[in-house]
Swiss-Prot record:
Dictyostelium phosphatidylinositol phosphates (PIPs) are unusual, with the lipid chain joined to the sn-1-position of the glycerol backbone by an ether, rather than ester linkage. The composition of the inositol phospholipids in Dictyostelium is strikingly biased, over 95% of the PI, PIP and PIP2 pools contain the C34:1e structure, with an ether-linked C16:0 chain (palmityl or hexadecyl) in the sn-1 position and an ester-linked C18:1 chain (11-octadecenoyl) in the sn-2 position. It catalyses: a 1,2-diacyl-sn-glycero-3-phospho-(1D-myo-inositol-5-phosphate) + H2O = a 1,2-diacyl-sn-glycero-3-phospho-(1D-myo-inositol) + phosphate; 1,2-dioctanoyl-sn-glycero-3-phospho-(1D-myo-inositol-5-phosphate) + H2O = 1,2-dioctanoyl-sn-glycero-3-phospho-(1D-myo-inositol) + phosphate; 1-O-alkyl-2-acyl-sn-glycero-3-phospho-(1'-myo-inositol-5'-phosphate) + H2O = 1-O-alkyl-2-acyl-sn-glycero-3-phospho-1D-myo-inositol + phosphate. Its EC number is 3.1.3.-. Belongs to the protein-tyrosine phosphatase family. Signal peptide: none annotated. One of its GO terms (molecular function) is phosphatidylglycerophosphatase activity. This is Phospholipid-inositol phosphatase. The chain crosses the membrane at residues 20-40. Exhibits phosphatidylinositol-phosphate phosphatase activity. Has a preference for phosphatidylinositol 5-phosphate (1,2-diacyl-sn-glycero-3-phospho-(1D-myo-inositol-5-phosphate)) in vitro. May be involved in membrane trafficking by dephosphorylating phosphatidylinositides.
Length: 232
């Protein structure tokens, strides 16, 4: 075998090794992405990593989310909880007019860490936003729940209507909503969950079991006169 033949064989071996490596990476990378998304959806990623991954995931998937929302495949955009409080999905700039004119909403509680909201549109309509960012799929802590409830109370005293939202109006904002119902109606968390599901069927069905929801309830609601039989 001459020198040229040796070089050719070496190049072939290198090309084969590179192709094999690319094939392995082509299998491992999609698996890693799928596993990361799964762990993210179950709040099993470290919160610091989940925060940055959630922002990237929102940027990559928001067009799909908007399409599904428009098609009505993600449930209702907005649901009314009582005379003054609404719960729903994250609003885009084009939704602010709807919130302001149709629903007479002028106060917002935004729990999206990944999205600060259409703040310029809020300013245009004189709407006030309480921004309490919580990483997607994680539960708001007790301080955030209490801060949100106090904001809602203050806005109602001022004659304003409030819109609570996260990305889909299911989990993070659902935790605020169930605490609001338990606090304002003086009912148990189990009853509050039933009321909330009647108002918005797509909220998480186990909100009343969440740790911080129960801690808030014990600290701020339990000493009130609880009516465990209040009708929906």
């Amino acid at each position: 075998m001459n020198e040229n033949e040796g070089i050719i064989i070496e190049n072939i071996n290198n090309d084969s090794g590179s192709t094999y490596l690319m094939n392995i990476l082509g299998i491992l990378i999609p698996i890693k992405i799928v596993v990361t998304i799964y762990l993210f959806s179950k709040a099993r990623l470290p919160v610091g990593f989940a925060r940055y991954f959630g922002r990237l995931y929102h940027f990559m998937t928001n067009p799909i989310r908007l399409g599904l929302q428009i098609a009505g495949l993600r449930g209702p955009f907005i649901s009314q909880l009582d005379d003054n409080v609404y719960l729903g999905a994250m609003p885009m700039g084009s939704d602010v007019t709807l919130l302001f004119y149709k629903y007479k909403i002028n106060s917002i509680v935004n729990l999206c860490d990944e999205y600060q909201g259409p703040t310029q549109h809020y300013t245009q309509y004189g709407m006030q936003q309480l921004y309490v960012p919580v990483v997607d799929h994680f539960e708001p802590d007790v301080e955030i729940i209490e801060k949100s409830i106090q904001f809602i109370l203050k806005q109602i005293e001022l004659g304003n209507r409030v819109y609570i939202h996260c990305k889909a109006g299911r989990g993070r904002s659902g935790a605020i909503a169930i605490c609001w119902i338990a606090y304002s109606r003086r009912v148990s968390l189990e009853v509050a969950q039933k009321i909330l599901l009647e108002k918005r069927k797509i909220v998480r069905k186990q909100l009343y079991k969440q740790k911080n929801v129960n801690q808030y309830y014990s600290s701020y609601c339990l000493n009130s006169n609880i009516n465990s039989t209040t009708s929906i």
